[in-house]
Amino acid sequence: MEENISDLVKKGNQLIIDGDFEKALSYFEQAVIMQPNNPDILNKKGVALRGLGRYDEAIECFNKSLQLDPRDLDSS
């Protein structure tokens, strides 16, 4: 199960680099279903949402990530 999540996140990260935020979001959404309280995955989902201009949803993801891990300075 962890490998599957790792693969989803790796694919999502590459898609963000490639600028395909819509497809990246689908990978991060799958990963969030598997680990809903993982602040790193929530942050990545927020990055994809921000790239799509869905700012309110992105802020929700960033805020939840910070609630789960207040030391996470990458949540932006």
Features from the language model and the residues they span:
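Conserved structural position within tetratricopeptide repeats
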Residues: 30-33, 63-67
